[in-house]
Design a protein with these regions (language model features):
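Catalytic alpha/beta core domains of metabolic enzymes, predominantly
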Residues: 1-114
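C-terminal alpha-helical cap/extension of soluble enzyme domains
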Residues: 59-60, 69-174
Length: 174
């Protein structure tokens, strides 16, 4: 289900406590509408083209609310800063690096029988960002079903991060 821009406008006018709207549709109808949304903070919840969607790049969103934000917080912050500094090409290049990693990780886990592909891909990437070089010496993420994601997934994703020069020198936990 997707709320219309008109519905969001009506809700924003009626309820002053309604201050944030997250669009996960990927269609971006609300953000692209020309309606007065009464100052609602718009965040995008769909992956991809990170450098194109923020207001400082001419896009309609104030920020992101993504699962990958936990993995790529530093990079998303850098994209925003690059855009603020007029470095659109550098922001686009970093965005593309992240997109390639995320897309390949989604494909990697697609047929895994436990969990869902989106959550599994993010768990793998977060595991690597948490432990850095130690990621292969730690147990892989444990899913709610009690199944661990395969270490081969961690190895593959670590290779992707290295290839894109996004592998952390030090994990945020280690």
């Amino acid at each position: 289900n997707e709320l219309t821009a008109e519905t969001i406008q009506t809700l924003a006018a009626r309820f002053p406590g309604f201050y944030l709207f997250k669009d996960t549709s990927g269609n971006d109808h609300v953000a692209r509408s020309s309606l007065d949304l009464h100052g609602i903070f718009l965040v995008r919840g769909a992956e991809g083209d990170y450098h194109r969607w923020l207001t400082n790049a001419g896009g309609p969103y104030n920020g992101f609310l993504l699962s990958s934000s936990n993995v790529f917080a530093e990079q998303l912050t850098a994209i925003r800063s690059m855009l603020d500094e007029g470095q659109a090409r550098a922001a686009a290049a970093l965005s593309e690096q992240m997109e390639r990693v995320i897309e390949k990780c989604f494909k990697l886990v697609k047929g895994f029988p436990a969990g869902n592909a989106f959550a599994n891909a993010i768990k793998i990437l977060d595991h690597i960002m948490a432990f850095g070089e130690e990621c292969l010496h730690r147990d892989p993420p444990l899913l709610y079903s009690g199944v661990r994601l395969p270490v081969e997934f961690i190895e593959y994703a670590a290779g992707l991060l290295r290839q894109e020069e996004l592998f952390p020198a030090r994990g945020y936990i280690s």
